[in-house]
């Protein structure tokens, strides 16, 4: 299989965890059925997401450095972290709809989310290796995200038709004790693992990388600070703010839809299907625009669109208006993620991709507790609308910082 497509298929797999577990299915189930209070459950979920961010920030750069140092380290880290993600995620099956399972569910969320982030950092570090040419990095990144968004649609349709919408889910799963919702976690793990196999086997059987001299903390520091703040350092600082805001959107979007507008699981699946199709198309187009123009421009336009979407969401008077607001999010968030990954790969030397994407993960997690904790706390004391609206501040700060970022022609 072409390495570019094996790379893209991994995105098909991990999208199931990101979309179904983190946001639109299991997060609302936790808040509404396990906690029994959507507002309080939303706060718990956001706080746990923030705690994951702290741990990723403390460990990802060093794991990335290890991956650069050890022979075939990046693919080894990818395999281990991916397997741990799918195994731990399957344990959501035991999260029954009782408040006695609050701590258990949050622990599973914490561990699976942590290993997912490490897996994702390793995956991103292999972007350049997955591209046939350096001037095709944007297209490879865009293809990956596009396949992830569109490829997950059959999975969502299966969940909708055979588990959620039907009166008698497959395998005689009982709706009364939410077995049908909990079983989705097992399906997510299976889906993720199956689509991760092509990439894991391709790189494992491919050209072997050699063991390198160990990288010190000083060498990691030089990537972002070399007598002055480097271009990479400036970009990562700007990314800290918009990545925080995106985390809130991803982990809190489903809970917000349930708490404010009363969306049902069936309606959430429908939103996901349409939104993913929109995101897939715009992300694929964005990948070509990355190579034709520049990633910074794509990032800034995407952030501007997300700012508009935040205000549209919190002012939505109806489910219908909220639905179309989410389509704007879908059209912007994919190109933003793809362009960010592309820019990071281009401004980082080939032999530092592991540690560079470890820092990339750090930039989305170093203050990742700020966005979720800010949104969660404002949600707890004020309202879900106010908590969600607060992320526009983070988007605006990042937009200002990116406007000051200077890139050379090569980047």
Task: Put a short name on every predicted segment.
Residues 21-42, 251-268:
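Short amphipathic helix-loop junctions that connect adjacent transmembrane helices
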């Amino acid at each position: 299989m072409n390495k570019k497509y094996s790379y893209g298929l991994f995105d098909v797999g991990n999208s199931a965890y990101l979309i179904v577990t983190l946001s639109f299915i299991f997060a609302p189930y936790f808040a509404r059925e396990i906690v029994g209070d959507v507002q309080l459950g939303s706060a718990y979920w956001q706080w746990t997401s923030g705690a994951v961010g702290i741990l990723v920030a403390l460990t990802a750069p060093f794991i990335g450095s290890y991956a650069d140092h050890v022979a075939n380290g990046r693919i080894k880290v990818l395999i281990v972290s991916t397997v741990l993600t799918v195994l731990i995620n399957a344990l959501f099956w035991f999260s029954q709809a009782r408040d006695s399972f609050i701590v258990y569910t949050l622990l599973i969320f914490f561990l699976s989310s942590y290993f997912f982030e490490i897996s994702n950092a390793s995956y991103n570090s292999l972007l350049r290796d997955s591209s046939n040419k350096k001037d095709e990095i944007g297209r490879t990144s865009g293809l990956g995200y596009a396949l992830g968004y569109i490829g997950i649609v059959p999975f969502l349709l299966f969940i909708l038709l055979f588990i959620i919408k039907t009166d008698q889910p497959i395998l005689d799963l009982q709706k009364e004790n939410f077995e049908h919702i909990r079983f989705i976690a097992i399906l997510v793990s299976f889906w993720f693992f199956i689509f991760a196999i092509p990439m894991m086997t391709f790189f494992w059987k491919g050209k072997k990388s050699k063991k390198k001299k160990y990288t010190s903390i000083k060498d990691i520091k030089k990537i972002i600070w070399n007598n002055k703040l480097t271009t990479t350092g400036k970009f990562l600082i700007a990314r800290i703010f918009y990545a925080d805001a995106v985390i809130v959107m991803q982990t809190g979007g489903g809970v917000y839809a349930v708490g404010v507008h009363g969306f049902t699981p069936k309606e959430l699946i429908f939103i996901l299907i349409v939104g993913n199709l929109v995101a897939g198309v715009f992300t694929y187009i964005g990948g070509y625009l990355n190579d034709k123009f520049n990633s910074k421009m794509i990032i800034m336009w995407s952030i501007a669109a997300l700012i508009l979407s935040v205000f549209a969401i919190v002012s939505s008077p109806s489910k219908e208006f909220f639905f179309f607001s989410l389509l704007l999010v879908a059209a912007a968030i994919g190109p933003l993620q793809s362009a960010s990954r592309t820019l990071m790969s281009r401004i980082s030397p080939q032999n530092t991709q592991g540690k560079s994407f470890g820092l990339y993960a750090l930039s989305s997690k170093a203050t990742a507790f700020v966005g979720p904790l800010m949104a969660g706390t404002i949600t707890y004391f004020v309202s879900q609308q106010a908590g969600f609206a607060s992320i526009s501040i983070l988007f605006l700060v990042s937009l200002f910082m990116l406007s000051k970022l200077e890139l050379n022609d090569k980047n």
